[in-house]
Amino acid sequence: MIDILREIGMIDRALDSIANIEFKQIDLARGQYLYVVRIYEHPGIISEQLSNLIKVDRTTIARAVKKLEKNGFIERKSDPTNKKIKRLYVTQKGKEIYPFIIRENQFSNSEALKGFSEKEAQQVHDYLVRIRQNIDGDWDGYNAL
């Protein structure tokens, strides 16, 4: 069997390392850009939903949210109907860096797909979606623990 996950892992680590260098100039620590983007795209999301969206455990989410809140990129607000629920929103500072993060992501995406036709790029995307869907059940079971 072809070990595709090793390749996916190497690609992920390389792109993550590059992103961390780029985002250091806007005071985002390792991997925090992803949280800012997802919260920006899903205003009012709760931590559990963010955990499922990003595919990281709740403890990691809690640490990241705490750091991002401390650094002024996001804020937690109580749900108007249930004060125990804390909803996440980007602050003005978070909104200001969002376009920069997206530009960097688009650049990385175009570099990664250099030499691919539009059809090939779509095929890669479709295959990766299928792979993610295959592991979603395992993730849901793991995350429920």
Locations of regions flagged by a protein language model:
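Short, locally clustered residues in the helix-turn-helix/winged-helix DNA-binding domain
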Residues: 9, 37-41, 102
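Charged, amphipathic alpha-helical coiled-coil/dimerization segments
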Residues: 66-129
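Key DNA-contact positions within bacterial/archaeal DNA-binding proteins
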Residues: 31-33, 59
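Pre-recognition alpha-helix immediately N-terminal to the DNA-recognition helix
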Residues: 14, 18, 34-37, 96, ...
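The alpha-helix within a helix-turn-helix
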Residues: 51
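Residues within helix-turn-helix
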Residues: 47-48, 59, 66, 86
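N-terminal leader segment of winged-helix/HTH proteins
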Residues: 1-26
